[in-house]
Amino acid sequence: MFAPILETLDSWDYPYIFLTSDSADPALTHHKQSKFIGTGNRAYAYLNGLSADVVVMTTPGLDVLQIKRARGVGHYCHIVHSLASPNYRVFGLDYYDSVLVNSVMQEEFIRQVERAHGVKRKEIFITGSTYCDALCARKERIVAQEGREIFASREGRKAVLLSPSWGKEGLLSKFGMRLIEAVLSTGHLLIIRPHPQSLISESLLIEDLRARTEGMEAVRWDIGTPNVHAMSQSDVMISDFSGIIFDYLCLYEKPVLTIDFDFDHAGYDSADIGELWEFGIFGEIGKRVREEDFGRLGEIIAKLTDGGGNQEAISRVRELLWTHARDSGVQSARAILGLRERVLGERLGRLKGYSDEILKIREVLA
């Protein structure tokens, strides 16, 4: 997520400190200015005592959940980690000062939520998707180096990737074995890749479904591996509203079949605005079906994968979503340094020593 930004700052020889709660984070070995801050309450305590001009985080809920606005921080910036709308739990972005987004659609979503909640208008910078850029750079290398085949033999069958979101509105919670059996009845292969949070919050559900599909020749559970394996080796995706839909579309330009149901917006920011823009384009990039269509999945999948998909629409949506493709690290770093320049400028009346830092930033941004 942060790798393209850190690599850009390193190339500019500009100092920063990267903090992580993942003891296995690659940045701890690849970037010298990195620190492991622990997990849980230990990490929250560290973050709540920060002193910095600008703090950039992917975690929503500032001043709502455990992470509070530290007195020593001049500016809080959120970076969106998905190509979809940043539809977090309610108030997820309300108290950030700025946001780095991927597209105009994400910007408009945030503006709608601001108006609905009556909160201060944030600065928004369209800087592209660092996540998508990093994944794009790694995908071919990962697949080539590991050479892992999910299915040893396909025998002419299509591979369907079931990749849902997590929670009560996710496909596995909503439909479970009914959907799995419907896909298998088509005669195709099925790769099930649950959302990582499902393994924590819905562990009993996942354990039950894995037990019920154990030994099925046409089923593979893809857990704990880079998602590019499943995406590259599948022909079509089935999902709900997960952001991985757009990863699949942007990286592989393959069709997506989405299950249409009455989404419960309670507890999410989207409860206070109109329909999410994603739901308006799902029909363009593949096919939208309801539970009563499960018996027709074979016919629908065949049409999508045998030239019946709208490739023109997929390419158009890809262009809208993936702005600044492969340049998000530079765009994001410039926005962050611009924010720091302003924070330092506001302090100049009291602390003249910051002027050298401002001059260095201007030199880098020139």
Name the predicted role of every residue range:
Residues M1-A137:
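Active-site and donor-binding regions of nucleotide-sugar-utilizing enzymes
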Residues M1-D13, T130-L209, K287-F294, T305-D306, ...:
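Conserved catalytic-core segment of nucleotide-activated headgroup transferases in glycan assembly
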Residues I17-K32, S185-W221:
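Catalytic donor nucleotide-activated moiety binding site of glycosyltransferases and closely related
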Residues S34-G40, V219-I223, E284-R296:
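Short acidic-hydrophobic, aromatic-tinged amphipathic segments that line or gate anion-handling sites
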Residues T39-L47, L204-F246:
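Donor nucleotide-activated moiety binding/catalytic core segment of transferases
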Residues V56-M57, H78, V101, L162, ...:
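Redox-cofactor binding/interface segments in oxidoreductases and associated redox assembly factors
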Residues L93, R121, G243-L320:
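Catalytic binding pocket for nucleotide-activated donors in carbohydrate/polymer assembly enzymes
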Residues E291-A366:
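C-terminal amphipathic helix plus adjacent low-complexity
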